[in-house]
């Protein structure tokens, strides 16, 4: 993974140093003022990864169990859960191997650890790209269902959805291979950052347009019922709150990581950028948090899926 400063790499575990005692430390910069560095304990990484792992496994199991959920929209949600699942698995695996190496319970040559590190980095990169793609696919699917409701089932068909899903996974695998092979090339980093900005812009435009259409529809109903102001204001506030949460979580969880990549290109030697580089572990933790929040936003709000989830949990007991 192309990072500067503090980073979670397996090779660093071969010559490990004791972890910081406090979660917040002021890290001195050689050419500038002190920096605030947030140290993320390995136990927290494991806990976040395991919570995300359980959540997303439940989403996949619920969608697989209920045939009523075998539709393009839920297939996109299922693939998002698989992507988040891979993010969690890769980080849990990396943390576990690092802990075993540091404790001396696992002996491995540097070359073997390097290969394992590359595999995990490919898994992380591919799952990140696929997660962003499926977030965009879900936004497009919802947009079509609102603005082209009568034509939705002819536009978003199962064969077309499967082709989109296959294309996303193939593109994610190819992207991860290119990223690991050419991570030290500026163009590769800029393409990843540009991809994130494009997904953010796509989601913002589509969801804002959907909110505007929903408010317009609510105003029409209010005029018929002669209660325009209360209904419109209440619906508008609820829709704006939902939109803020959806886009806010996306930006807060993914933004710092891609800011990190941008600064590697723009100011790799600047003291202020160096302060940001030191918090790379925090940025990874935020991405895992996004994998925890995604099921709450996209999956568990469905009554049908929640009902199926209860059945899955009852069967497991």
UniProtKB/Swiss-Prot annotation:
PANTHER family: G-PROTEIN COUPLED RECEPTOR (PTHR22750). It is found in: Cell membrane. It comes from the Eukaryota. It comes from Capreolus capreolus (European roe deer). The keyword Aminoacyl-tRNA synthetase does not apply. The chain crosses the membrane at residues 38-63, 73-93, 119-140, 164-183, 192-211, 241-266, 280-300. GO terms for cellular component: plasma membrane. This is Melanocyte-stimulating hormone receptor. One of its GO terms (molecular function) is melanocyte-stimulating hormone receptor activity. The gene is MC1R.
